[in-house]
Amino acid sequence: MKKIKKRASILIKILEIYWDSNGIYGSPRITAILNKQGINISQKKVSNEMKFLNISSIHSSHFPHRKSTMTAEEKAIIHNLILNLDINRPNQVWTTDITYINTIYDGTLYLISYIDYFSKRIIGWHLSRTQKTSDILIAFNKAVKKRKPLPGLICHFDKGSQFRSKLYRQTIIDHHFLYSYTELNHSCDQNAAQESWHASLKKEWLSTRKLYHFEDAYATIMEYIEGFYNPKRIHSSLGYLSPIDYEKEFFSQKTPSK
């Protein structure tokens, strides 16, 4: 009887964690949370119980990369400053990119996001009907206003034409920041934070929702970023902490004890 009650309790906890994550978490993350709660259970056991409950993590999808053409002058500015760099603090490296968001009635929208590479936190974003340099700068200015980074910050991005524009590069310079690009013929891991973020947004959130208009898309994305991704979504690379909790842990270790 005790074993039956114990298993029932674990099954309930697995379901609670699963539904609290909106069906996003699989056995690795659920196991990590259970262990943090003091429940000693293996990932294999959690996986088996999830099969018993007939639940599973939302599966990933493949999103093709955009291709862009560059002039010889533009190719000359392509330098990757974060390759082999030890990224060990917030506001050391930001990454940014654009991804496509499809709606039923308002067509294709464009989401520009800035991520703190250290914590994977979304620090500035903008949803637009266009993908102009001015749209990029709206998201950039939001991130700067929120984070107030010191000079020397590295802004790393893909090779899209907006990021290669003189206006954008000059804006980076005016803030006393450095710009960095993924290399020509690069592998996707050179902008891995953005690739991972876009995949998470689309497979975990947008794939289960219908977006009819711009307003629907904006509200849905804001709900994911502010309500789940930043404060709650745990990452294995962050020691199974959320981006906000990872930053809190970093700053708590830097604060001298009284």
Question: Which ranges hold each PLM region?
Answer:
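Basic, flexible linker segments flanking DNA-binding modules
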Residues: 1-90, 187-188, 242-251
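RNase H-like two-metal-ion nuclease catalytic core shared by retroviral integrases
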Residues: 69, 157-159, 165-168, 181-202, ...
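C-terminal domain-tail junction helix/linker
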Residues: 173-175, 200-258
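Short small-residue beta-strand/loop micro-motif enriched in glycine and branched aliphatics
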Residues: 121-125, 179-182, 207-208
